[in-house]
Amino acid sequence: KKYMIRGNHDYWWASANKMRNLMGDAITFLQGHGTAELIQTEEGPRIIAFGGTRAYLCPGDSHFTPETDQSIYDRELMRTEAALQEMNKAVEILREEITAEAKVDITKLNKADTTDSDKAYPSAIDIDSIPVTKILLLHYPPFNESNAPSGFTDLIEQYKVDTCIFGHLHDQISFNRIPKEFGSTKLELVSADYLDFRLKEIM
């Protein structure tokens, strides 16, 4: 499954809805949106939640001009929070669906095994035992050139994002200054030239 966010040069990108209408289910376009899905891992089932938007230059960056950039920055903060809220909602809905399906399956199994008490199944699933991993996709890094806290890092901490993936940076100085973590959030720089144009395994 493929997830895509808008970059700073993607002028062809009209809107997430128009892109979805064009591509169908082949790609999930995230622009202030979030989603979640259940996957199977070697350790068992896990819920992966994705949210994303373009983000923007942060205040304090040498290229940030308040007169022209502040309103765009504020808008991208709203889109980021909308994506994180939608991620959380998608996780809740997925948990409800998993619980409902499990109850139906358990009911069928119990009816089939009414003659053998040793084969009785529990009436509910411990949905809270399924771990959730929250991944936020941004084009811009969530901080300025000094790696100073920003509105984006505030949201990352508030919504307990596990991994933040971003790009935009294409110079060695930036490559060297990016931290591996911000608080409890893992940071992944995935600019193509930084990765030598190779795929990056996140988890």
What are these regions (language model features)?
Residues 1-43, 150-161, 190-192:
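Core catalytic region of metal-dependent phosphoesterases/phosphodiesterases
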Residues 2, 7, 50, 168, ...:
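Divalent metal-coordination and catalytic microenvironments
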Residues 8-16, 36-37, 57-61, 141-149, ...:
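Active-site environment of divalent metal-dependent phosphoester hydrolases
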Residues 17, 37-44, 71, 85, ...:
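Binuclear metal-dependent phosphoesterase catalytic core
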Residues 47-56, 135-137, 186-192:
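Active-site-proximal beta-strand elements of phosphoester/diester hydrolases
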